[in-house]
Amino acid sequence: MTRMKNSSSNVTSASGSGSGSGGFVQPLPASLLQPICHPRVTEVTSEVNDYFLTHWDFPSEKLRKKFVAADFPGVTCLYFPNALDDRISFACRLLTVLFLIDDLLEFMSLEQGSAYNEKLIPISRGDVLPDRSVPVEYITYDLWESMRGHDRSMANEILEPVFVFMRAQTDRTRIRPMGLGSYLEYRERDVGKALLAALMRFSMALHVSPVELTILGEIDVNCSKHLSVINDVYSYEKELRASKTAHAEGGALCTSVRILADEMAISIEAAKRVLVFMCREWELRHQVLVEELRADGRQSASLTAYVKGLEFQMSGNEEWSKTTLRYNNVV
């Protein structure tokens, strides 16, 4: 495995909005978690990027460069550093196509976006053949067929979480006023936590029983909050730009940063700082919950691997969010 130089292990301090530090002007507490990257990251990134540059219909050379700079395979390799070598490419391709679709949805109404995603659902199941002249259709179909060819049972376990995520993307909840608590409940679906958990299990060939998943419920929810809020903190400038340039519904600003700033009557930068402190508390909470699981004698080998995988998702998400050019308007 490739251990990342842990930029989270030092106190973060930066000034200026969109500088890669979320616009912070004061030191932030260090993360308790250490990111690790999959050892095949360089090879897989090249393979996956080349595939999408060949098959996806990018409207311009600028957008092709922006796609490469976003480094979607890189974040997948940070999410799942313990993925099997013959499965990490599947995970990279799935998250990449979902990111690309997410960008398209910003320029659609919620109704248009819902129709777009709903058309892809039976294609993903293999119930409907794709239109080979439409890249998103055949990319989606071919990916799911190849995943099922590799491990039909575990691939099919990812389907429903993906559909929940896709429907959350166009849920009208996102354009309604929300408090922080209800927002985090919505984001558990929109950030794709169940999707990431199922994809982690597939990528690691990690078999966890339904009973064990129930035991992990609170740990999963805690992780979801961390993923959602870190994403919000570092993507705020990107989402703000989208709210001004994209569709009024698809690009609507839906973020814990704005919600907390409005509720507490504090600045955006102050809201970001408070949210990062909250994430550090969720990291502590994760450690407490894992220790309770161990103390109760309920932590099997599969559960140990699962909860460690959640740590890598949290640390990997933060590492990528702080460095990706997707959130820093360089390209």
From Swiss-Prot:
A motif (NDxxSxxxD/E motif) lies at residues 231-239. Residues 1-22 are annotated as: Disordered. It comes from the Eukaryota. Residues 7-16 have a biased composition (Low complexity). Its cofactor is Mg(2+). Its EC number is 4.2.3.9. The keyword Cell membrane does not apply. It catalyses: (2E,6E)-farnesyl diphosphate = (+)-aristolochene + diphosphate. Pfam families: Terpene_syn_C_2. Keywords: Lyase, Magnesium, Metal-binding. Mg(2+) 2 binds at D102. One of its GO terms (molecular function) is terpene synthase activity. Binds 3 Mg(2+) ions per monomer. Homodimer. This is (+)-aristolochene synthase TS1.
